[in-house]
């Protein structure tokens, strides 16, 4: 896994190679101009914009935005091609997270994609939770396999037979492994790019400890990393909390999660999960160790994962009627430089200035590109890069060349500013930081505006119909949660618990559960979800 400094050096090297190629192109342009050749026709193509607005048809809007540069639909339903624009976002998050877990002494590994039925079915509660989603290989050529082989929906049962082999004594602990891989969950209802797909990329960490205290500590450390991915990189506000018994990981002791919320649809999204598995899997797979007193004990285990769902949440949160809006930290192109030639102005000088500007930014560690395509108008390029979501646009025209300045245009709010070339790098860095922070603050304000505190069933139903993120006092009983699901089941989906936030508001004595009328034990977020 390359570290950020290596990535920076790679970008600079690629930029220098690109500059050399662009010089050849410019020489051809200059030669054509001086020889009096007819200027190439500039395309004024239409159809760049989206056909629907985000607040009018969210589902169609989301599909159109994803299809621009993020994914391509595949000929198998629920499977998608991740194009370079989205894959780069995944790689940037991967670099951050991989470096952080290595600080925690987690090591990367890789386990096979295939699972034998005997192993998969060993942990009854676990497999019952995943059974409807498991895909099976049943043939080899035209012959039926004697024993069908499952494709991993998650890797607990794949990995843990070998944990029992590798762990013998207390000196073998903790064992901390992570793998970056794909998994398959054969979703049959409403596949959605990034959010619900049959195959997706993720990381899954699996750790074993001598004590529950160590496991508990790691659960929260990992959850904090997931919060940072969403809030610091994707500029998406999330709530950290505990899942209910009904919603926790099948076979686990407890599940923590970061939960996002999409105001346009009024739905929550489980952003990432960090589970304490307790000793249940250790019992099933006989993962024991000899402690310092020569006594045999079972290990305590965790598992934790985040996936390419993160990208879908980012698109839903920040995208607008022009297309994507990318936070600078995860944008593969943070700045695009566009020439704006005018009539008989010094076109070659403008092109040279664009190349020099992009190169200066790249040298400073900013991911920048110049768009020197001469068969598209500046206006067409503006729309194209706006749709791609590039955080900052720099325009250079004759007046900018004359005044030794550039014009910047922010993607998040459209604000334009003329800045001197002498302070270009410092100013652009500052702007990118402001864009990142503003995107987070705007998203947080929108989410907070959707939070509705309720105390009665009637208030709950009203808030649910108004697409609110509902915070309600709850008795913390599984049967009551199941009853809420049953009573709210409809065309838009049943309401359920999202999480009980770690940051609990005060619960006055005598507060009753909104659904059962029994004494409330905690505040819990409720809503419909993806």
Swiss-Prot record:
User: Which InterPro entries would you find in this protein's record?
Assistant: aa-tRNA-synt_IIb, aa-tRNA-synth_II, aa-tRNA-synth_II/BPL/LPL, Anticodon-bd, Anticodon-bd_dom_sf, Pro-tRNA-ligase_IIa, Pro-tRNA-ligase_IIa_arc-type, Pro-tRNA_ligase_II_C
Q: Where in the cell is it found?
A: Cytoplasm, Cytosol
Q: Which UniProt keywords are given for this protein, alphabetically ordered?
A: Aminoacyl-tRNA synthetase, ATP-binding, Cytoplasm, Ligase, Nucleotide-binding, Protein biosynthesis
* Gene Ontology CC: one annotated term: plasmodesma
Biological processes per GO annotation: prolyl-tRNA aminoacylation
- Database matches in NCBIfam families: proS_fam_I (TIGR00408)
The protein depicted here goes by the name Proline--tRNA ligase, cytoplasmic
